[in-house]
Amino acid sequence: MPNGPAAERENGAHDPTAGAAMSTAPATNIVWHHSTVTRAARAHQRGHRSAILWFTGLSGAGKSTLANAVNSALFEQGLACYVLDGDNVRHGLCNDLGFSDADREENIRRIGEVAKLFLDAGVVVLTAFVSPFRADRARARALVETGDFIEIFCAADLDVCEQRDTKGLYARARAGEIRDFTGISSPYEEPEAPELRVETGRQSLEESVGQVMAHLETRGIIPPPGEG
């Protein structure tokens, strides 16, 4: 998983003054313009469906590592895919957000909307975010049709995640140096019924990738290798 300044931003070591005030008034007089190229047409051309793969779990559970490995496997098969990473989006799209509950909610709201655009563009989009709250994940799921959102719980015990933390972020959180750190000073709500539970704390990366790829094939999102 990423460490250093980017990882600290993902998990709460963030300037508490970040986040400028925004207007709460919604835009008016806007109309949705439908594309002349449909999602179905893109799927037909590319030979695979689009989907949102939502990787969630504690910091250090292996979300980004697994998402990027699955992304590579999809790419090697010639499939359209892209990773939205929790650290990366805070460099741009969400660099005005901190780690309060409200900011976390807004962070996931934005990612859900971006993922929906990728879905319409015919891409298998892999999102790797702690996304600690069930309600926020449920809102992201509700943006799309049933079957388009695949929640993948990267399950790893807290002690395993701490052992993987070479930069000592968990230790700093326990010492009170990092505020709102998920799993220590901020809660993580495990998925109650994820489409897929991957034991990233126990099995190898290769096994985890194989589990995800097999699930996508079973659901008819991607073709078996050699049939694309």
Language model features by range: what are they?
Residues 68-116, 120:
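Conserved substrate/cofactor phosphate-moiety recognition/catalytic segment
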Residues 55:
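Hydrophobic anchor at the beta1->P-loop junction of P-loop NTPases
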Residues 2-4, 8-52:
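Extreme N-terminal, non-catalytic leader segments
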Residues 59:
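The conserved Walker
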Residues 63:
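Conserved lysine of the Walker
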Residues 92-99, 113-174, 180:
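ATP-dependent NMP and nucleoside kinases share a basic, alpha-helical "lid"
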Residues 155-158, 163-211, 218-228:
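Small-molecule kinase domains that catalyze NTP-dependent phosphoryl transfer to phosphate-bearing small molecules
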Residues 83, 149-151, 195-197:
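Conserved beta-strand scaffold positions in the cores of enzyme catalytic domains, especially
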